[in-house]
Amino acid sequence: QANDLDYASLPDSVVEQVRTNGQLALEGDKGELGEQAILSLAQALDTYIPTPERAVTALDTMPSAVGYQPTLAEEMGVLQERYLADTANKGDLSNIPFGTVNLLAYNNYQAYLTMLGKTTDVTGNCELPEGVEMVMPGDNIKNPGVTKYLPTTSYSLPHVNVGTIGHVDHGKTTLTAALTRYLADLVDDAELLELVEMEVRDLLSTYDFPGDDTPIIIGSARVSAAASELAVQLKMAVVHDDTNPTSAAQTNAPWGLARLSSYWGLTLHLPNLTEEQGVTIDEDHPLFIYLPCGIGGAPGGAAYGLKNVFLGSSAGTTREVEHSDKPLHDISYAYLGDARQNWVMTAQTTQAIRLEPSATAGFAGPEFIVNSNQGR
């Protein structure tokens, strides 16, 4: 780890390293890797970044952001627009790192690219290119072929990343849960829950959200998952459908997606589904696929399968893109500004297909997909 820090020009001599085991800590272990390590980690954070001082009494209404969490772009900060791939001429692959976006500069069509960038903190300042006064999420950039768009962001608050070894989702969530267990006070008095709800509503109203009208359901997901009764889940579902009638749960959808075991299987089964339902997929009738949050590498798997199904070609390779890969005249990208997302975008420039991944935290990247037995 010290060598890695030196390679990245980070101060290994002053970086505090705390060995922990989040699972042991959650199980109540009092040893060096359990509770003691979690408390040492919190102390190290406070010592390394003394300002702003960590709030120990403030009401925390949402989990802390630990590590890479692309879905927080819509929850915690300001979306900036950013495009990382350099312009590439046809056949020129020498300067393109393997796995990043490789788009050809076609001149006979106009591409409308909607690109969402990385998250800035709530006090971040977005520096725009010359001549641009304002950028809003969802702005369209009209340009033939490849677009390079590079506003930068300055941060006024320090950022802390808590790194883990192993599976990024399991590691960071387990460690976050362990930190919460030992550093948060349990509200186990039913009468205090009413006060907590009042504070939450006041906080929502402070930021111009409808605090008085927002439905709040008190429950424990862990307890509900282990219980035979589904009262909390059912109550949440009813409140959601009543509050958002236009996006109510689909109870009679025609496509039997539940019978599929994976998103890769979904892409292989799509031709049969479209034929059964009499659905046409072409430039005038594009296919939109929305993937829910928390599915890890599914966006990459779905994109990989879609390219094989509809184009008969492999995604994530360095071969020159064929003319059959020519994108639609109007393509929308849900862009998160990450190298792994860049590779997903390569697979998304397919005929009449729009893939909108909302979470890729567990995606292992192009090298894993192309070079591993699991990926193949």
From Swiss-Prot:
GO terms for biological process: alpha-amino acid metabolic process; defense response to bacterium. InterPro entries: EF-Tu_GTPase, P-loop_NTPase, T_Tr_GTP-bd_dom, TrpB-like_PALP_sf. Pfam families: GTP_EFTU (PF00009). The keyword Zinc-finger does not apply. Coiled coil: none annotated. The keyword Isomerase does not apply. Keywords: Antibiotic, Antimicrobial. SUPFAM superfamilies: P-loop containing nucleoside triphosphate hydrolases (SSF52540). GO terms for molecular function: GTP binding; GTPase activity; translation elongation factor activity. Has antibacterial activity against Listeria monocytogenes. PANTHER family: ELONGATION FACTOR TU, MITOCHONDRIAL, ELONGATION FACTOR TU-RELATED. This is PCM7-4. It comes from Bacillus velezensis.
